[in-house]
């Protein structure tokens, strides 16, 4: 376990760490209140593409989480920023509930493909349209490439397998904007005044949450909720700084050993 260092910021994953769909992880609300009592900056970072930031915030508040909109950094935010920098017109393969986060982005006559988690759109006709755009030279932008995520009824395919299918079919490589990309974590820390070495990431995905954070110099805490499966902590090198049962246990460790 790494030595204690000056901790200034805590990054927290949402789905699978604080909640699973419309159910909170037991004890998570109270644990967040305890963490807020410490002298640390908190940011909530998520790869979710199933809903807009506003809808996500409403879901969290209904679960009685004390969270403000400016504390949330999403992969949809990162994707929009990239689209604006590149000045492209995307074919948006995202859930309809996520479309408000792309308001004002021109989508007619698309010359780029943006792919998130959009089960209703992942059928042959739509994917073939994306395939043809890519063959014509359009860039492929993946909001993230998670292999799977946790639902109430079990694990479910994430966008990663569908992004990889288009990469394979077109012999191209997607630009990924969400976790575990280094730029995602650095952007999430922007404005906090904190360096990666002064931050810790808590999440249920060993690769995207913990591995990605540790690659930029943060500590990574893996929780055994959400998509976690036995021995996940052995799948990355270096291994997680800490593996624990749930978010409340992670908060206990931070308060007792990192502050």
From Swiss-Prot:
Binding-site residues for Mg(2+), renumbered to this chain: 13, 15, 204
Cofactor note: Binds 1 Mg(2+) ion per subunit.
Pfam families: Hydrolase_6, Hydrolase_like
Cofactors demanded by this protein: Mg(2+)
In-chain residues carrying the UniProt-annotated modification N6-succinyllysine: 50
Cited CDD domains: HAD_PPase
Binding site for substrate: 13-15, 46-47, 179
Superkingdom per UniProt: Eukaryota
CC per GO annotation: cytoplasm; extracellular exosome
Keywords from the named record: Coiled coil, Magnesium, Metal-binding
Ranges in a coiled coil: 47-71
UniProt entry tagged with the keyword Magnesium: yes
Gene3D superfamilies recorded: HAD superfamily/HAD-like
GO molecular function: enzyme binding; metal ion binding; phosphatase activity
Family: Belongs to the HAD-like hydrolase superfamily.
Protein name: Haloacid dehalogenase-like hydrolase domain-containing protein 2
Source organism per UniProt: Homo sapiens (Human)
